[in-house]
Design a protein with these regions (language model features):
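Ligand-binding clefts/hinges and TM-proximal coupling segments of bilobed small-molecule sensing domains
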Residues: 148-165, 202-204, 233-270
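Ligand-binding cleft/hinge of the Venus flytrap
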Residues: 46-48, 60-68, 137, 149-166, ...
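Extended ligand-binding regions for polar small-molecule ligands
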Residues: 57-66, 125, 132, 145-147, ...
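Periplasmic-binding protein-like
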Residues: 38, 115-122, 187, 191-233, ...
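Flexible hinge/capping segments at coil-to-helix
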Residues: 122-140
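A ligand-binding cleft/hinge motif common to bilobed small-molecule-binding domains
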Residues: 80-83, 95-105, 151-155, 176, ...
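Extracytoplasmic small-molecule ligand-binding "clamshell" domains
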Residues: 28-96
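Short helix-initiation/N-cap motifs at beta->coil->alpha
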Residues: 72-84, 128-129, 145, 163-177, ...
């Protein structure tokens, strides 16, 4: 009986060790889930086959190679991005997200990887030439819900009427069809949409706020993953990774920004 008990105990210990080892391996091998809203080309979008594509996707693939982890992209509505980290549904969020104090209270951000200034896409017939000329009774401003442009307009353009919409394309449509006088968003997006709608829109690039910084977000307290992301960003920049992303995704915009004398998107202080 004693011998049988010892054998059972040994068997239990062996099974426990195997199970524990298997769990550890599963954690290390499971994909890193990256949440982003696939509605913001050329950063977060889909290719012709419907697969996730864009600059942010390529950046995360490079991080996966660096970390030795498979990357799984999850298309997530903008309002669900931060909650996806809080609930553990996602490990990482990268979605052209500005580092802001209110967001930093909910998630941890990486070191900034990009600069972005707000600009205005105006209706060509609106007569809008400055941000101040939007702040008048009777003026209508299209904003993407929850975006930095939305918050800026809400705090600073109180005389105008805000048209709050779910995505960038809806805002551009409001402006190009004359239902809104302007759309406040980042310079790159404004430039691209101005080029796509040259007869119905005008671009106002006069700076009216400090550059905002974009970061990669992780769940609050995930110091290990955050440190790994920061180390990757530093090495990726040093090795010319952001220059390659610019060449592939933003070559026309880089040339235009150089001509206009604007600070480039990825020109960050070391």
């Amino acid at each position: 009986m004693k011998k049988k008990s010892i054998l059972l105990l040994v068997s239990f210990v062996i099974l426990f060790v195997i199970a524990a080892g298997g769990c550890g391996k599963a954690d290390g091998d499971k994909p890193l889930v990256v949440a982003m809203e696939l509605a913001y080309p050329p950063f977060e979008t889909r290719n012709d086959a419907g697969e996730p594509a864009g600059l942010s996707v390529d950046l995360m693939k490079a991080f996966g190679e660096y970390a030795g982890r498979e990357i799984k992209i999850e298309n997530t509505a903008w309002d669900g991005l931060i909650p996806s980290l809080q609930t553990g549904a996602a490990d990482i969020v990268i979605s052209s997200m500005t580092i802001r104090p209110d967001r930093a209270r909910q998630v941890d951000f990486s070191d900034p990887y990009a600069n972005a200034l707000l600009a205005v896409l105006a209706n060509a017939d609106s007569g809008i030439e400055t941000i101040e000329s939007l702040n008048q009774p009777g003026k209508k401003i299209a904003v993407k819900s929850g975006s930095t442009g939305h918050l800026y307009a809400q705090d600073n353009l109180t005389e105008a009427e805000l048209i709050i919409l779910p995505d960038e394309s809806a805002c551009v449509t409001e402006v190009s069809q004359g239902r809104a006088d302007g759309f406040i968003y980042d310079q790159l997006t404004v430039y691209r949409n101005w080029q796509n709608n040259p007869d119905t829109t005008a671009a106002i690039f006069i700076p009216f706020q400090e550059p905002e910084k974009w970061g990669i977000a992780v769940q609050k307290g995930n110091a290990g993953l955050l440190a790994q992301i920061n180390a990757f960003l530093k090495e990726y920049k040093k090795e010319g990774g952001f220059d390659e992303l610019t060449r592939v995704h933003l070559a026309e915009e880089k040339e235009a920004f150089d001509t206009l004398g604007f600070q480039w998107f990825f020109d960050m202080a070391d």
